[in-house]
Amino acid sequence: MKVGDHAEVSRTFSTADIQDYSTLCGHEFEQSRVPEPLIGALFSYLLGVCLPGEGTMYLKQATRYLQTVTCGELMSARVEISRLRPDKELVDLSTTCRDANGRLVTTGRALVYVGDVPRGMQPGV
């Protein structure tokens, strides 16, 4: 891993996704709008599966939501390494999500612990 490494995923949420999420959390959401936690879940996916990947421990996330996303709208979420702290086995990442027109939907930062990430994938290894 090095500063500048990134991972990205694109996703469209359907009204069925919103209904399933509403059932899971016990709260009704406007069916045409994607709830913010579903957008944030894209970052969790990227961090746990792609970069740094399996073994990553999510410590902190700060996200600023700049606009709403409607069902059926394509979004692209991205995480990018902004700082490595190999002495503490920590990685700082920037997090962004854009809509199909390239407009910024969210911006934020994440902090993850990578001590349990397989050797060879850790910073400085």
Predicted regions and their residues:
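Hot-dog-fold acyl-thioester-processing enzymes
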Residues: 1-56, 60, 119-125
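HotDog/MaoC-like acyl-thioester-processing domains
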Residues: 2-3, 71-74, 78-125
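A structural detector for beta-sheet-dominated domains
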Residues: 10, 66, 113-115
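Short, well-ordered turn and helix-capping elements at secondary-structure junctions
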Residues: 25, 67, 81-83
